[in-house]
């Protein structure tokens, strides 16, 4: 949280204040003691948001070419958030708004070569925010396959539909 607040405000005291506030809140301790997995989802959602803010700031300063690292790290964090709990998928909507918003802001800067950057951002967005998270989500089911080598995509799909119907 310290890094996130510091990146947003560029002030050390704001980072310290955010860190102190998160340390003073006992929700994460309570949730970990009652064995809910929300703390994992929350961590990866915040990590993905941190990398998206870094990406947005980097795009406005360096362009899309110089911003692939935060984009890739954000996609990995998003994938881990989705793999730990479906709530991470909903957080993806917020990430998409930031992602599209920074592309709009970059377009408003009237930089030459914007459409080349836009194509790179679109390919990077699909690769890092759709393909990589999906592969991470699939990898989270490897223990099923290790236990039962006949576990296939149909079984994986049945797990998804069962989770959906259980929660709806």
What do the predicted segments below correspond to?
Residues 1-10, 49-56, 139:
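Transmembrane-helix signature of membrane-embedded glycosylation machinery that interfaces
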Residues 30-40, 86-87:
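Short acidic/glycine- and proline-prone juxtamembrane loop motifs at membrane-interface regions
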Residues 2-24, 59-69:
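Transmembrane-helix signature of polytopic, membrane-embedded enzymes
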Residues 135-168:
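Aromatic-rich transmembrane-lumenal/periplasmic boundary elements in polytopic membrane proteins
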Residues 48-71, 100-109:
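Membrane-interface transmembrane helices that cradle and orient dolichyl/undecaprenyl
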Residues 15-23, 50, 78, 82:
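Short helix- or helix-capping micro-motifs
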Residues 87-105:
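Transmembrane-embedded, aromatic-rich helix segments that form part
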Residues 69, 110-131:
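Membrane-interfacial entry segments at the cytosolic side of transmembrane helices
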């Amino acid at each position: 949280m310290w890094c996130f607040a510091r990146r947003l405000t560029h002030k050390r005291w704001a980072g310290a204040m955010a860190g102190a506030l998160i340390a003073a809140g006992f929700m994460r301790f309570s949730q970990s003691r009652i064995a809910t997995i929300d703390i994992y989802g929350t961590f990866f959602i915040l990590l993905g948001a941190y990398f998206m803010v870094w990406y947005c700031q980097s795009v406005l300063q360096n362009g899309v070419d110089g911003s692939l690292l935060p984009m890739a790290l954000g996609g990995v964090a998003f994938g881990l958030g989705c793999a730990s709990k479906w709530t991470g998928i909903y957080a993806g909507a917020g990430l998409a708004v930031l992602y599209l918003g920074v592309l709009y802001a970059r377009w408003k800067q009237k930089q030459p070569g914007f459409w080349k950057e836009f194509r790179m951002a679109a390919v990077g967005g699909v690769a890092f925010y759709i393909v990589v998270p999906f592969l991470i989500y699939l990898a989270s089911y490897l223990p099923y396959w290790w236990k039962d080598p006949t576990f296939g995509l149909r079984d994986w799909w049945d797990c998804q539909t069962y989770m959906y119907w259980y929660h709806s």
